[in-house]
C-alpha cells in the first residue's frame, strides 16, 4: 500500500476519534500504530470478502432489528457507518446504547443490532473492514411509525340539536407513513368524508385530518360513530368513537279521559313528555289563562260547556325550549245561545230576516216557528219572511234541540208597519138604564193618528158629548178606545156604532152593536132552570108551531096571489113582492117618521140579513125588466113612461173603491150614515184630514146607493156582515138607466092607502129634484 493511503487512514481514525469524543492524542496514536502494524500483516497476501452484507429492512418503531455483516477469517476492526457517520470502532458502541455489535468475532461476524428501533434509526447503514480495506453495500433501514390515537373533536359525546346536520372531525397525527382514516357506523363504512395531510418538521412523519358531514335525516339519537386510523405500522389501525346525543325540546302528548263526558263531570288531563335534556317545568292554561293549581303531569277538573270550545293547554319546558299542546273536551251540553236574535220593525211588503246562532254537543237542530203555530218555518240559523203582511206580525220562536241532552229557545217580535187592525167584538152588552161601554181594540204600527166613533148623525173622537164619552188608553198590545154611554135607553140597542182608526198607512173600521144584557141573562137562566122533560115538551111545541106557521103561510100566500091578480096598476113578480117606484115631493114630516120606522124595522128584522137583501135586489131587477115589456093594462089609466135621472142624491156619495190594504176576511156591516157630512162638519172645526172613505149602505136618503159587493156566504153566524169589494164608480138609484113607471097623483093617492113602506130624503130642501120612493107590497 502506498504511504499516502496510510496517512489517509490515520486521518480517518483521528476524525473518528473526535466524533467519539476521544480527547487523548496518545490513544489515537497507539490505534494508528496498531492498525498500521496489523495492516502490514494483512497486506502480506491475505484477501478478505463479505459473506453477509446488510440488507434493506423495514421495522416498526419500537421493535428490534439486526443488520448483518460477516467477513470470514477477518479478525481486524469493523466499522459501522450510519448515513456516513461512524458509530464506533469494533464492538465498542457505547455512545449508542441501543446499538450492539453481535456475532462470533472469531468467525468474522460483526452484526449491528438495534434493540428498539426509533424514528432516528431510519437511515442508510454500511459495514466497513478497515484492515481489509473493504466495505459493504449500503442498506436502507426504514422505521415505520404508527399514528397517534385518533381523536374526534367534541367526543366522546357529541350533543346535537334536533334538525341540525352533524359535522365530525377526526385527526391522526405523527404517523409514518401518513395514516388512512375511515368512518364506521354499525360496522359499515360511511362514505363522503374529506381528508387533508400535513408533513411534520422532521420531514418523515405526517398528520391527517378527516371531516364527515351527516344530514339530519341520517342521524339517530344514541348512535355511535367510529373513526379508524391505519398505516403500515399498524395494519389493524387505531380507532375512536363518539356517541350522538340529539337534544330537543319536549315532545308532548296530551290526553283527556274520559271522553265524551256530560257537562259537570270530572275529567283528567295527562301531559306526558319526552325531552333531552330533562323537563324542567309543566304549566297548564285554559284559553290563555294560567291554571295555578296545576303544576305536574296531571290535571283534574270538572268540565262545563266552555271546555268544548276553549282548549286546555299543557306547556312543557327544558333547557332547549318549550312545547305547548292543547286539547278540547268532547263535552255533551244543551243548546247555548251565541248570537241573540233581534226583534224587527218593517214596513208592509218588505222582507224580514231573523237570525239566531246556537251551539250544542252533539249536533243540534234549529227550528223556527211562529208562536201559537205548529208550522216549521225554517231549520236554518236564518229565517227570512218575504213581503210580510200584517198577519205575519207577532212572536217568533227560534228553538234549538240537542237530542237526549236538552233544548232552548228565544222569542223575537215582528212588528209590521201598516194600516190599523181593529179586532173588537162586534156585539157587546149593557144593561138598560145603566151605564154601558163599547170597547174598540186597535192594533196599529205606527200608532193611530186618529180614532173616531160615529153613530147616527154623531161623531166623537174624545171627550164628552151629552150622554156619550170617549176615552183612549194605550196598552202594550195596542190601543183601547172606549165609548161610554150613560143612562142607556132602548134606542141605544138599536143603533149601529162605528169605530174607525187611521194612521199614515191607511185606516180600518169596525161596526159594533149593543145588546141588552138583562134579556139574554133571563133567557139563559130560564133555559138552565128547565129540566130535560120540559126541553122535550118545548121542542115538540116549537115543531108543531113551525108546522102550523108553514101551513098558514102557504094558505096566505095562495090567497094573496089570487087577490093580487085583480089589482090594477100593479105588476106581478116571481117572488110575490111588488115594487112601486113613484116620484114624490120630499119634506113631509110623516115621511121622515115612516123612514125612521123602516130603518128600525130593517134592523129589527136581522140587521140587513143577506138573504133579504139578495131577494130584494133580484126582485128589483126582474120587475124592472117586466115593466119594460108590459103593455098598459089600464087602457091609459096609468101612464107608463121610461125616463133618465141625471141628478144624484147629494146626501150619499160613493167614491170609487180603492184597493183595501186591510187584512182580507174582515167582515163589515153598513153604518147607516154618510161620513161625507160628518167629515165636512169636522173640517169646519179646523181639522184637516184627507182620508179615503168607504161606505156600505146609506139609509139617510130616499135612494139606496149600492156598491157592488160580494156577500160572504160562509159567515152566516153574523147575518149583518158582508165583505167589501172594489167598486168602479158611484152607483145610486138616481143614476140607473132603466125604465121606471110613473104614476099620476090619483094612483099615488090610492097606492099610498095600501100597506107600504116609504123612504124619504134626510134633507128637506124643497129645491132638490123629485126623489123616487120604493114601495114594497106583499
UniProtKB/Swiss-Prot annotation:
Synaptic adhesion molecule required for the formation of target-specific synapses. Required for formation of target-specific synapses at hippocampal mossy fiber synapses. Required for formation of mossy fiber filopodia, the synaptic structures connecting dentate granule and GABA neurons. Probably acts as a homophilic adhesion molecule that promotes trans-cellular interactions and stabilize mossy fiber filipodia contact and subsequent synapse formation. Required for the coalescence of vomeronasal sensory neuron axons. CDD domains: IgI_2_KIRREL3-like, IgI_5_KIRREL3. Residues 1-21 form the signal peptide. Homodimer; mediates homophilic interactions to promote cell adhesion. Interacts with NPHS1; forms heterodimers with NPHS1. Interacts with NPHS2/podocin (via the C-terminus). Interacts with CASK. Interacts (via extracellular region) with MAP1B. Interacts (via extracellular region) with MYO16. Interacts (via intracellular region) with ATP1B1. Interacts (via intracellular region) with SHMT2. Interacts (via intracellular region) with UFC1. This is Kin of IRRE-like protein 3. Expressed mainly in adult brain, bone marrow and stromal cells. Expressed in diverse regions of the brain, including the cortex, hippocampus, striatum, olfactory bulb and cerebellum. In brain, expressed in pontine nucleus neurons (at protein level). In hippocampus, produced in both the dentate granule neurons and the GABAergic neurons, but not the CA3 neurons. Expressed in subpopulations of vomeronasal sensory neurons. Expressed in a subset of neurons in dorsal root ganglia. SUPFAM superfamilies: Immunoglobulin (SSF48726). The gene is Kirrel3. SMART domains: IG, IGc2. Gene3D superfamilies: Immunoglobulins (2.60.40.10). Undergoes proteolysis by a metalloprotease and gives rise to a soluble form. PROSITE patterns: IG_LIKE. Disruption phenotype: Mice are viable and their size is normal. Mice show defects of the accessory olfactory system characterized by disorganization of the glomerular layer of the posterior accessory olfactory bulb and formation of fewer, larger glomeruli. Mice display a loss of male-male aggression in a resident-intruder assay. Mice display moderate hyperactivity in a familiar, but not novel, environment and defective novel object recognition with normal performances in Morris water maze spatial learning and memory, contextual fear conditioning and extinction, and pattern separation tests.
Amino acid at each position: 500500500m502506498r504511504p499516502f493511503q496510510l496517512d489517509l487512514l490515520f486521518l480517518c481514525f483521528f476524525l473518528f476519534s473526535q466524533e467519539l469524543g476521544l480527547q487523548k492524542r496518545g490513544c489515537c496514536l497507539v490505534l494508528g500504530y496498531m492498525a498500521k502494524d496489523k495492516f502490514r500483516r494483512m497486506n502480506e497476501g491475505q484477501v478478505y470478502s463479505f459473506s453477509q452484507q446488510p440488507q434493506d429492512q423495514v421495522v416498526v418503531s419500537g421493535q428490534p432489528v439486526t443488520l448483518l455483516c460477516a467477513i470470514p477469517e477477518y479478525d481486524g476492526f469493523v466499522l459501522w457507518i450510519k448515513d456516513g457517520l461512524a458509530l464506533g470502532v469494533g464492538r465498542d458502541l457505547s455512545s449508542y446504547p441501543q446499538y450492539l455489535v453481535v456475532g462470533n468475532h472469531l468467525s468474522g461476524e460483526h452484526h449491528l443490532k438495534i434493540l428498539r428501533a426509533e424514528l432516528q434509526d431510519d437511515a442508510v447503514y454500511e459495514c466497513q473492514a478497515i484492515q481489509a480495506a473493504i466495505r459493504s453495500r449500503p442498506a436502507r433501514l426504514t422505521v415505520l411509525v404508527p399514528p397517534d390515537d385518533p381523536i374526534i373533536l367534541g367526543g366522546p359525546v357529541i350533543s346535537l340539536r334536533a334538525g341540525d346536520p352533524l359535522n365530525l372531525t377526526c385527526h391522526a397525527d405523527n404517523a409514518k407513513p401518513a395514516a388512512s382514516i375511515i368512518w364506521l357506523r354499525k360496522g359499515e363504512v360511511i362514505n363522503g368524508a374529506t381528508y387533508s395531510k400535513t408533513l411534520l418538521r422532521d420531514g418523515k412523519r405526517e398528520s391527517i385530518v378527516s371531516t364527515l358531514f351527516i344530514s339530519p335525516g341520517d342521524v339517530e339519537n344514541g348512535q355511535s360513530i367510529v373513526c379508524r386510523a391505519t398505516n403500515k405500522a399498524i395494519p389493524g389501525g387505531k380507532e375512536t368513537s363518539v356517541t350522538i346525543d340529539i337534544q330537543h325540546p319536549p315532545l308532548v302528548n296530551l290526553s283527556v279521559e274520559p271522553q265524551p263526558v256530560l257537562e259537570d263531570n270530572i275529567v283528567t288531563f295527562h301531559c306526558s313528555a319526552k325531552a333531552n335534556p330533562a323537563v324542567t317545568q309543566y304549566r297548564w292554561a285554559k284559553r290563555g289563562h294560567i291554571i295555578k293549581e296545576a303544576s305536574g303531569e296531571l290535571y283534574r277538573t270538572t268540565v262545563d260547556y266552555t271546555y268544548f270550545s276553549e282548549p286546555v293547554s299543557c306547556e312543557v319546558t327544558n333547557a332547549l325550549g318549550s312545547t305547548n299542546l292543547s286539547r278540547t273536551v268532547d263535552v255533551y251540553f244543551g243548546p247555548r245561545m251565541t248570537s241573540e236574535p233581534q226583534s224587527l220593525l218593517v214596513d208592509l211588503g218588505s222582507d224580514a230576516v231573523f237570525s239566531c246562532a246556537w251551539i250544542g254537543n252533539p249536533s243540534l237542530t234549529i227550528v223556527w216557528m211562529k208562536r201559537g203555530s205548529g208550522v216549521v218555518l225554517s231549520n236554518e240559523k236564518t229565517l227570512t219572511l218575504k213581503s210580510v203582511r200584517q198577519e205575519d206580525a207577532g212572536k217568533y220562536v227560534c228553538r234549538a234541540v240537542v237530542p237526549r241532552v236538552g233544548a232552548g229557545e228565544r222569542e223575537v217580535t215582528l212588528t209590521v208597519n201598516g194600516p190599523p187592525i181593529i179586532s173588537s167584538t162586534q156585539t157587546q152588552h149593557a144593561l138598560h138604564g145603566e151605564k154601558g161601554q163599547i170597547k174598540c181594540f186597535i192594533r196599529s204600527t205606527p200608532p193611530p193618528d186618529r180614532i173616531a166613533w160615529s153613530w147616527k148623525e154623531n161623531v166623537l173622537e174624545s171627550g164628552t158629548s151629552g150622554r156619550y164619552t170617549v176615552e183612549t188608553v194605550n196598552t202594550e198590545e195596542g190601543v183601547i178606545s172606549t165609548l161610554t154611554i150613560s143612562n142607556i135607553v132602548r134606542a141605544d140597542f138599536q143603533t149601529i156604532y162605528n169605530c174607525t182608526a187611521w194612521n199614515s198607512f191607511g185606516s180600518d173600521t169596525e161596526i159594533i152593536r149593543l145588546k141588552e144584557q138583562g134579556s139574554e141573562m133571563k133567557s139563559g137562566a130560564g133555559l138552565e132552570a128547565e129540566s130535560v122533560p120540559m126541553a122535550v115538551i118545548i121542542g115538540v111545541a116549537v115543531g108543531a108551531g113551525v108546522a102550523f106557521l108553514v101551513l098558514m103561510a102557504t094558505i096566505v100566500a095562495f090567497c094573496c096571489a089570487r087577490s093580487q091578480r085583480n089589482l090594477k096598476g100593479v105588476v106581478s113578480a116571481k117572488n110575490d113582492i111588488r115594487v112601486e117606484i113613484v116620484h114624490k115631493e120630499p119634506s113631509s114630516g110623516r115621511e121622515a117618521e115612516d123612514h125612521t120606522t123602516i130603518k128600525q124595522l130593517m134592523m129589527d128584522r136581522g140587521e140587513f140579513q143577506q138573504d133579504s137583501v139578495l131577494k130584494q135586489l133580484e126582485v128589483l131587477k126582474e120587475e124592472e125588466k117586466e115593466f119594460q115589456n108590459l103593455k098598459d093594462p089600464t087602457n091609459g089609466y096609468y101612464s107608463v113612461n121610461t125616463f133618465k135621472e141625471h141628478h144624484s142624491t147629494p146626501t150619499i156619495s160613493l167614491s170609487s173603491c180603492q184597493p183595501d190594504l186591510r187584512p182580507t176576511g174582515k167582515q163589515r156591516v153598513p153604518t147607516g150614515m154618510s161620513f161625507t157630512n160628518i167629515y165636512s162638519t169636522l173640517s169646519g172645526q179646523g181639522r184637516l184630514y184627507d182620508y179615503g172613505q168607504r161606505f156600505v149602505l146609506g139609509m139617510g136618503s130616499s135612494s139606496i146607493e149600492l156598491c157592488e159587493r160580494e156577500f160572504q156566504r160562509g159567515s152566516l153566524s153574523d147575518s149583518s156582515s158582508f165583505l167589501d169589494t172594489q167598486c168602479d164608480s158611484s152607483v145610486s138609484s138616481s143614476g140607473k138607466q132603466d125604465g121606471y113607471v110613473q104614476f099620476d097623483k090619483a094612483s099615488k093617492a090610492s097606492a099610498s092607502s095600501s100597506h107600504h113602506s116609504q123612504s124619504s130624503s134626510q134633507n128637506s130642501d124643497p129645491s132638490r129634484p123629485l126623489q123616487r120612493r120604493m114601495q114594497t107590497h106583499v
